[in-house]
Swiss-Prot record:
Sequence similarity: Belongs to the bacterial ribosomal protein bS21 family.
A GO biological process held by the record: translation
Species of provenance: Nitratidesulfovibrio vulgaris (strain ATCC 29579 / DSM 644 / CCUG 34227 / NCIMB 8303 / VKM B-1760 / Hildenborough)
PANTHER family referenced in this protein's UniProt entry, alphabetically: MITOCHONDRIAL 28S RIBOSOMAL PROTEIN S21, SMALL RIBOSOMAL SUBUNIT PROTEIN BS21
Keyword Ribosomal protein: yes
GO CC terms, sorted: ribonucleoprotein complex; ribosome
Protein keywords: Ribonucleoprotein, Ribosomal protein
Protein's recorded name: Small ribosomal subunit protein bS21
NCBIfam families associated with the record: S21p
């Protein structure tokens, strides 16, 4: 079972802005928004592989550039 982020407020220290900020941080940390954007449209497996390969190439080139500068 997946635990979803949630923020509980007491009547004593009810500060909506702080609670909202805390909730947004938990949602971002859980990766819910990025997962939702990823699943918003169907992506063919071939397109996913192509994107993954391009990202790996980009990381490799970045690593090479970083090594050349140092």
């Amino acid at each position: 079972m997946i635990s979803l982020p949630g923020v509980y407020l007491n009547e004593d220290d009810y500060n909506f802005d702080i609670a909202l900020r805390r909730f947004k941080k938990q949602v971002e940390k859980a990766g819910i928004l990025s997962e939702m954007k990823k699943r918003q449209h169907y992506e063919k497996p071939s397109v996913m592989r192509k994107k993954k390969k391009a990202a790996a190439r980009k990381r490799l080139l970045k690593k090479i550039r970083k090594m050349n500068m140092a």
